């Protein structure tokens, strides 16, 4: 907890410092076609992605290909996969006005401050100037947009989040796939009675639990609730907020998550599900290679399936509307944007989609077809096809929406709520006051 409080404090300090500094460059964020000679040099990309992941591997290859015709060019990848550490690094560099040519960020309140200060190139104009804008999935771009609709980040992924489940374990407990979110607590109780852990969750990284607090409000009030909540225009005492808090508390009482979940990490959760110890696992299509190929444990392979986020009685969003993120986006530093950066991005963004789709992943664009691996189970194709039937709304992860201090506090309080260490009333009081104190610094 001390580490979390320290991170939140650093983020707040960086925000204050950022608010006091100028844009630091004369570049016009809307000037996406800089004139002049392309002069090869090293450019850097500050990113928060798996070091051995497809995005980095492909961009390394494309950078090497570009360098063949542009001697002296290189792409320096500065990666920090751990998200809290990355955010701290990003905010520190931004406050010091030392951001590299390219940098990763979600569409957070902090990032919107950077955009307002002219530090980020207009990504919509950039993509249109490269004649690739229309290739992108609208939902992939919408995920990257700020509240005002502006686009400053470019997506490199497109994912769908499902609740994966073990059919045999549900059958053993005498339960079926829930039709409503409200059925899940009772479902967990039945699974526990049968000696089965209901959900495997990565509690250590905190964002997986934070997903759950977004679900009831998204069904009850749609995507507008978090837009208002983060600004202090809605509260946890409102019907949608109250329903979220009470539901999270009921998940805790029903022992929906594995014992000691708060200290267990990503691989722990994955192993619990793939070894048949847990009945359900809430994760995205980035895990298809682990869950829908012959890499999956043969003992459970034929029992695995998935369902999408259940609706609720009177839900204002549809069953085909759920969390469909395009991952952390890449911003282009307006201060260092020059003919070289422009030329490299044109080269890379034109070739990237086909390279990415060839890995078996969903591209953020629709002009390429994802290659289904030879070792895939039928579930792989079934999951990919869900991308063709998405509604217009999407559930935004709250960690991309809240100010840094509020988000850090929410993650702490959610663990305490689910563990039964605090009451719903205590949670509500703490969070509403935290938002009231911190939102004005970011949403003026």
Annotate each predicted stretch with a short phrase:
Residues 3-14, 21-112, 117, 129, ...:
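Conserved N-terminal structural module of periplasmic/extracytoplasmic solute-binding proteins
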Residues 68, 173, 254, 295-360:
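Extracytoplasmic/periplasmic substrate-recognition and gating elements
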Residues 100-101, 133-168, 197-200, 317-323, ...:
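A structural signal for short loop-to-beta-strand junctions that line the ligand-binding cleft
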Residues 108-162, 185, 212, 305:
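Hinge/lid segment of periplasmic solute-binding proteins
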Residues 124-136, 220-243, 295-299, 311-321, ...:
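Short, solvent-exposed loop/beta-turn-alpha elements that line the ligand-binding surface or hinge
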Residues 148-156, 161, 185-234:
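Extracytoplasmic/periplasmic solute-binding protein
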Residues 190, 231-261:
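Glycine-centered hinge/linker elements that transmit conformational signals in sensory
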Residues 229, 362-369, 382-436:
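C-terminal capping/gating helix-and-loop segments adjacent to ligand/active sites or protein-protein/ligand interfaces
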């Amino acid at each position: 907890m001390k580490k979390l409080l320290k991170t939140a404090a650093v983020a707040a300090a960086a925000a204050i410092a950022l608010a006091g500094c100028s844009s630091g460059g004369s570049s016009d964020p809307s000037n996406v076609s800089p004139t002049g000679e392309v002069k090869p040099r090293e450019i850097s990309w500050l990113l928060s992605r798996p070091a051995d992941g497809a995005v980095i591997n492909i961009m390394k290859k494309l950078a090497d290909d570009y360098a063949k015709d542009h001697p002296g060019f290189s792409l320096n990848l500065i990666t920090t996969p751990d998200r809290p550490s990355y955010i701290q690094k990003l905010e520190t560099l931004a406050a010091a006005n030392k951001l590299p040519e390219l940098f990763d960020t979600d569409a957070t309140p902090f990032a919107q401050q950077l955009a307002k200060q002219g530090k980020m190139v207009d990504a919509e104009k950039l993509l249109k100037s490269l004649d690739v804008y229309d290739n992108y999935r609208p939902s992939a771009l919408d995920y990257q947009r700020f509240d005002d609709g502006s686009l400053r980040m470019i997506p490199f992924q497109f994912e769908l989040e499902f609740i994966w489940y073990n059919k045999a374990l549900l059958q053993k407990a005498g339960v079926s796939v829930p039709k409503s979110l409200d059925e899940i607590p009772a479902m967990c109780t039945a699974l526990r009675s049968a000696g089965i852990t209901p959900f495997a969750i990565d509690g250590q990284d905190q964002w997986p639990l934070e997903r759950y607090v977004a679900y009831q409000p998204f069904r009850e009030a749609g995507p507008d609730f978090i837009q208002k909540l983060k600004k202090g225009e809605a509260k946890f005492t409102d019907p949608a907020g109250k329903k979220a808090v009470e539901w999270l508390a009921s998940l805790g009482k029903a022992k929906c998550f594995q014992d000691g979940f708060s200290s267990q990490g990503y691989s722990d959760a994955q192993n619990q599900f793939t070894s048949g110890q847990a009945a359900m696992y809430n994760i995205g299509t980035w895990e298809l290679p682990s869950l829908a190929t012959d890499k999956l444990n043969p003992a459970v392979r034929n029992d695995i399936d998935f369902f999408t986020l259940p609706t609720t009685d009177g839900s204002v969003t549809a069953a085909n509307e759920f969390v469909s993120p395009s991952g952390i986006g890449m911003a282009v530093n307006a201060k260092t944007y020059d003919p070289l950066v422009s030329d490299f991005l044109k080269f890379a963004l034109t070739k990237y989609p086909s390279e990415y789709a060839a890995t078996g992943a969903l591209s953020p664009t629709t002009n390429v077809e994802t290659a289904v691996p030879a070792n895939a189970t039928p579930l792989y194709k079934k999951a990919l096809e869900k991308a063709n039937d998405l509604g217009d709304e999407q559930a935004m992860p709250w960690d991309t929406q809240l100010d840094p201090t509020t988000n850090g506090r929410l993650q702490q309080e959610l663990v305490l709520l689910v563990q039964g260490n605090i009451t719903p009333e205590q949670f509500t009081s703490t969070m509403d006051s935290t938002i009231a104190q911190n939102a004005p610094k970011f949403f003026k």
